[in-house]
A protein has these predicted regions:
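N-terminal signal-anchor transmembrane segment
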Residues: 1-29, 44-54, 341-343, 356
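Aromatic-anchored transmembrane helix interface
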Residues: 11-16, 36-48, 57-81, 93-99
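Membrane-interface helix-loop-helix junctions at transmembrane boundaries of multi-pass membrane enzymes
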Residues: 25-37, 152-166, 203-213, 322-337
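Alpha-helical transmembrane segments of multi-pass inner-membrane proteins
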Residues: 92-119, 133-202, 325, 339
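A membrane-periplasm/extracellular boundary helix in multi-pass inner-membrane enzymes
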Residues: 110-113, 199-248, 266-271
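Long extracytoplasmic/lumenal interhelical loops at the membrane interface
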Residues: 119, 125, 129-131, 246-307
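Hydrophobic transmembrane alpha-helices and their immediate junctions
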Residues: 200, 306-342, 370
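Transmembrane alpha-helices of multi-pass inner-membrane enzymes
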Residues: 335-344, 350-379
Length: 379
């Protein structure tokens, strides 16, 4: 986005892997996180079949790195984070550390992208409004910022911080909406609803009494932000979310081609249901069968097609392992929220960026309340 030279877009994923390995070197990881070791083992047969099935002119290492850097990043992060105890205050500091770069990105988009009316060309995703980077990925990250800001407004009991976060929520939401990429924004809305539900079920009576006014303020801010976005885009954003083109005609495919990509990946799974067709092979399979040259947008169907039965078991490991944490009494609402963010994001944007992998790991953290220190007074 900023025109950086020499830094790969995979840098973030490998950085997360590196930091997590350093953390495990110093403090280790719990034995109960063994399912994520199993997850990595289940990915290895796909590498073997990739070496057998990939075309001769395909760069084997690039294909493996592009498709497995995300899952490996997730597994390493989960190994480190699973049931790791952390205080609520420290967890909020981590969320703030995630939020601040997202705000910086939103400010960059505000300063260095053209006026949205100057780059309107229809109801498709807008690269110019996304800083020249993938609108899907930009909207995903901005959606993550919206989720964190939403959680802060609900949980932090400070009027000044709440007002500041409401303003930032409006700003980040606006920048996310005008990318014209729906995935990240819809994901943020679903995750916010899940956060409210879990918070309401686990909060005490005093916390519940403050919930409704806060939700009302947030709803008002979002409505005003959407109205401003609609005016700024001359109503095209309304047509985008109504699945219409600029002329107001309803589009046949609400998934913008993702359903066709998913269909070819499932066809590949039916062709080799036990072994899969090999890591990175689905792109070649799609080109041969449909003439469409496109990477996957759905990590779930990619696991099925490229890893076969091993991919199905691997997905079951990722879904079922956190279930042991969900039903614990007084569980943090961030657990369900972050798991939903991971699942919805990999379903529309695969694992192009490190965010879904890292956020999945954060969902596994065990948040505890810090005990007040006992002060010993000397006579």
């Amino acid at each position: 986005m900023t025109g950086g030279v020499g830094i790969s877009y995979e840098f973030a994923k490998f950085s997360v892997i590196g930091f997590m390995l350093i953390g495990m070197f110093f403090v280790g990881f719990t034995r109960k996180s063994w399912p994520y070791i199993l997850f990595m083992v289940l990915l290895t047969p796909g590498i073997l079949f990739s070496a057998i099935n990939l075309d001769y002119d395909t760069n084997f290492l690039s294909a493996i790195s592009f498709n497995l850097s995300g899952p490996i990043c997730l597994a390493i992060t989960a190994l480190y984070c699973f049931k790791r105890k952390i205080t609520r205050e420290r967890f909020e500091h981590i969320l703030l550390a995630i939020l601040l770069p997202i705000i910086s990105m939103a400010v960059y988009l505000f300063l260095y992208t053209p006026n949205i009316r100057d780059v309107l060309s229809g109801t498709h995703s807008n690269f110019a409004a996304s800083g020249g980077y993938g609108p899907n990925q930009v909207a995903t990250v901005l959606g993550l910022g919206m989720i964190i800001l939403f959680g802060r407004i609900i949980t932090i009991k400070s009027r000044f911080i709440n007002i500041l976060d409401l303003g930032l929520l409006a700003f980040v939401s606006y920048r996310g909406i005008i990318t014209f990429s729906r995935g990240g924004i819809v994901t943020a809305a679903v995750c916010a609803a899940a956060f409210i539900l879990v918070y309401f079920l686990t909060a005490d009576r005093r916390e519940k009494s403050t919930l409704l006014p806060r939700i009302a303020f947030i709803a008002g801010v979002i409505m005003v932000t959407w109205l401003y976005s609609s005016i700024s885009t001359l109503g095209l954003i309304d047509k985008r979310y109504s699945n219409q083109d600029a002329a107001g005609r309803v589009k046949e495919d609400v998934s913008t081609g993702r359903a066709e990509l998913m269909k070819t990946e499932l066809d590949a799974f039916y062709e080799a249901p036990f072994t899969g067709i090999g890591v990175g092979k689905v792109k070649e399979f799609r080109l041969d069968s449909t003439g469409i040259e496109s990477a996957t947008h759905n990590e779930v169907s990619r696991l099925f097609s490229e890893h076969g039965l091993f991919g199905l078991i691997a997905l079951m490991v990722l879904v079922t392992t956190p279930l042991s944490l969900i039903f614990k009494k007084k569980q943090s609402p961030y657990l369900v929220t972050f798991l939903l963010f991971w699942l919805l994001t990999i379903s529309h944007s695969s694992m192009r960026i490190a965010a879904p992998a890292f956020i999945y790991g954060l969902a596994l953290i065990h948040i505890i309340h810090a005990k007040p220190r006992t002060i010993i007074h000397r006579k």
